[in-house]
Structure formats: structure tokens, C-alpha cells
Amino acid sequence: MWTASKLSIATLIAVGSMLSVGSFAQDNEYVEEVVSIGTRGKPRSVSSSPVPVDVLSSEDISKTGTDDLLLQLQGSVPSLNVHLQPISDAASMIRPANLRGLSADSTLITVNGKRRHHASVIAFQGGGVNDGSQGADISVIPAIALKRVEVLRDGASAQYGSDAIAGVINFVLDDISEGGSLSYKMGEYTEGDGATSTISGKYGMPLGQDGFVTTSFQIRQADDTSRSAQRPDAAALIAAGNSAVANPAQIWGAPKIDDDVTFFMNSGVMNSDGSESYMFGNYSERDVDGGFYYRNPDGRSGVFTIGDYRAVGNVD
């Protein structure tokens, strides 16, 4: 009896230990993010990737407190910098984003894993690394249309080509098949300028039994900002009686943005053979009014003269 009782007690202790270990493992179970960028093989988890990859969910992006996707990414991705570009020609309208200190066209931009075309703007007069670069326009992608953003912060030109020297940013569009959301944001700077209002939304619909159609939109208005001081030469013209000179004559700040409208659509359906048919696209437009360098008529004698006659001599 003593031996049997001892064996029974030992068996119970062993079984109890096994159950507690199993319960502990189940409580700490988690699912890793799987990414496909930065590897030639099959998709792998972030922790097993041989290169630095950041995965940002739509919730992570929305926590930054701004409605500008460029600024949202700058606040979430290490080594990604985006600058306001006052008086930088068209770069004031399509702001370049720099990953790892390299030019905007050194970062490959993809949407759903497909290469995004470059913008029509060549950055000019902004100075620094972006002069002459022609990157993709990230600002046309509304944050509400995204499921997640994958950022490869390492050179990948051997895999993707020379436009991935700085890395790769892959925007994965949301693929909901029902429901949606609507949001409205507004704000301004403490100086009292730069008032911004944004309304955005998305809605998902089923496509057959195994498909989806997700549509999203964003409408944004932004007033300009100015941190300018009057130029001395413009102030001298005003003092001389020229009332046509603006104050300030040259504006340094963010441009005014009107009717910034963006629409995105993402759809997909599973075929009977296991393959997937998909389609996505976008439409966007906006009007931008920004400042430029001041042309002093008093110092442009080669332009405002006809022979020895000064064409602007009597301008008030």
C-alpha cells in the first residue's frame, strides 16, 4: 500500500506540472507580423528577417496626431525625414521624403507590393540631397486607406533595383469586405495660422463569396503659414512711396492647399484554382498656392528698360 500510494502521488504531481506548463505557454501565445519585403524567398516574420523591417498598423499611424501621411510616417519610422519646402518650386507641392539621409528617388515606393510610379516633379531649389531627385508622391495616399505600412530600412538595390538604395516602403491597402469608418480632424498652429481640416472615410463591400471591394476617400483643406519678415529692399520701396509692394513681399512658410481630394479603391477575389484576381487604383487632385522669390523692380534694369529708358520709373 505504501508503494502504490507513493506512485500515485508522484503521477499526480507530474500530470499537474504538465498541465501548468501547457497553460502558461497558451497564455503567452502571440502572432508575429509576416512581411514579404527584403527577402527573395517566401514571406517571413519580422523577428526572423535578416534586415531591419518596421511594420506599422493603421492604428499606429493614426496615433501621431496629424492628418498628413508624410508627417505620420516621419513620427513613426526611424531615419525617415520630411521637410516643408517653402519657395522650392514644385517641391513645395510634392514634398520629398528622405530615408536614411538619401534622396527621395533612392527609396522604392510600392502599393500592395507593386512599384509606384514617380511623380512628375523634379525637386529643384530646395537645396541639399533632393536637388534633381524625382520621387513618388506619397501624399496622395490617405492614411485611412491603409491596413499597414512595411518599411525596409536597408539598401536593397541588388533585389529591387537602383531606386531602392535607401530602402523600400510598401503601403498595404485595407481589404475589408463590410463596415467602414468616418473621421474628421481639424487644428491650427499656436500662431493662429495654418488651420487644417480633414474629413476621411472608408467602406467595404463583399464581392461574391470570397472577394471584397474597399473604397476610401480624403478631403483636406489647409491654410498657409508665414514666419516671414519684410525684406529690406521691399521696405525701402514702400518707404519711397510704392504702395504696390506686399507686406511681406516674400513669404516663408507652408503653402495654402485647397480642394485636396483623394480617392482609393482596392478589390480582390479568390478564383476556383486558388489564384487571386485583384485591382486597385486612385484618383487625386489639389490646388496649391505658395510663395516665391521677390523680384525687386528697382534692381532689374535689364528687364525693365527699353534702351536708356527706364520703364518702371514712374511706378508708384
Where are these regions (language model features)?
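N-terminal periplasmic "start-of-domain" segments of outer-membrane beta-barrel proteins
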Residues: 33-64, 91, 120-131, 180
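Non-catalytic regulatory/gating segments with a bias toward low-complexity or hydrophobic composition
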Residues: 53, 61, 73, 149, ...
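Transmembrane beta-barrel wall of Gram-negative outer-membrane proteins
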Residues: 191-316
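Short acidic/polar hinge/loop motifs at secondary-structure boundaries
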Residues: 114-153, 307, 313
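Outer-envelope beta-barrel architecture signal
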Residues: 69, 107, 176-180, 209-213, ...
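N-terminal periplasmic accessory domains that precede
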Residues: 69-72, 76, 97, 110, ...
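Short, polar/charged loop or turn motifs at beta-strand boundaries
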Residues: 49-74, 96-102, 133-139, 186-190, ...
